[in-house]
Amino acid sequence: MLLLINSANCQVAGFAVATVGWILTTTSMGLVEWRVWYIENNALMPPGLVCVGMWKVCVYHHVSDHNRVTLCQRYSYRDPNLPLDIRVSQNLLLIASILGLLGRASIIFALRNAYLGILRENATFNPFVASGILNLASGVCIAVTVVWNYHSVMSEHGISFPPSLSIPFKPNTQEIGSAFLVACLAAFMMLLSGVIFLSHKFSTAIQVHPQTSDM
């Protein structure tokens, strides 16, 4: 009993990491600064800044030193103008958010059982392990999105936006934005929480069933 409660106390740290990671995941989904395009003199639009997100794009035109015009337009998975990497990343981020939410629910259930003394080490279903697997899967989904976005920016891939936005296919220069960094941190924390849940479970199992030396 005491061993299980001590194990649960250690898992609280993993739960906190997973919670922050899940919050960062959902935050990165709503941010538009996944890719930052810098547009200089162009026939389609005046000099400005274009921020490309996973679900919308925003165009910023500087009218003066203190004023700027912002135009944002949302797009969906079925938008034919979207490249494959953005369409796949939309699904990966949604899956990561759902898996992270399920992982949090599983660890809450596990902590409740541990503190009530009804969690068994030899149970067929261990919510600690389930939470670790879910968080690892969530972290992998986010990591794939991050790597793919980074590759697209470094390779200077273009995007065919609707003509109404008057955005060129490729900018003069482009770079990764703040949403990329938020997603990187989210992926790290989700993976870390998954490792914490799984590794501590295995270390607890070793303590419960120690190896005995031959006499």
Which ranges hold each PLM region?
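Short amphipathic alpha-helical segments embedded in low-complexity Lys/Glu-rich regions
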Residues: 41-44, 122-125, 158-161
